[in-house]
Amino acid sequence: CCGVPNAACPPCVCNKTCG
């Protein structure tokens, strides 16, 4: 979902900073 205009996941998923 990262890099897609309609990204369905929070930015932290792409930044790998979740949790």
From Swiss-Prot:
Signal peptide per UniProt: none
Residue numbers of 4-hydroxyproline PTMs: P5, P11
Major location (coarse): secreted
Record PTM Glycine amide, positions in chain: G19
GO terms under cellular component: extracellular region; host cell postsynaptic membrane
UniProt superkingdom: Eukaryota
Disulphide-bridged cysteine pairs: C1-C9, C2-C14, C12-C18
GO MF terms held by the record: acetylcholine receptor inhibitor activity; ion channel regulator activity; toxin activity
Cell compartment(s), UniProt: Secreted
Tissue expression: Expressed by the venom duct.
TM regions (residue ranges): none
Keyword list, A-Z: Acetylcholine receptor inhibiting toxin, Amidation, Disulfide bond, Hydroxylation, Ion channel impairing toxin, Neurotoxin, Postsynaptic neurotoxin, Secreted, Toxin
The family this protein is said to belong to: Belongs to the conotoxin A superfamily.
Domain notes: The cysteine framework is IV (CC-C-C-C-C).
Function per UniProt: Alpha-conotoxins act on postsynaptic membranes, they bind to the nicotinic acetylcholine receptors (nAChR) and thus inhibit them. This toxin blocks the fetal muscle subtype (alpha-1-beta-1-gamma-delta (CHRNA1-CHRNB1-CHRNG-CHRND) subunits) (IC(50)=66 nM) with 1500/2000-fold greater affinity than the adult (alpha-1-beta-1-epsilon-delta (CHRNA1-CHRNB1-CHRND-CHRNE)) subtype (IC(50)=96000 nM). It blocks the currents completely and dissociates rapidly from the fetal muscle receptor. Has no inhibitory activity on various neuronal nAChRs.
Protein's name in the database: Alpha-conotoxin OIVB
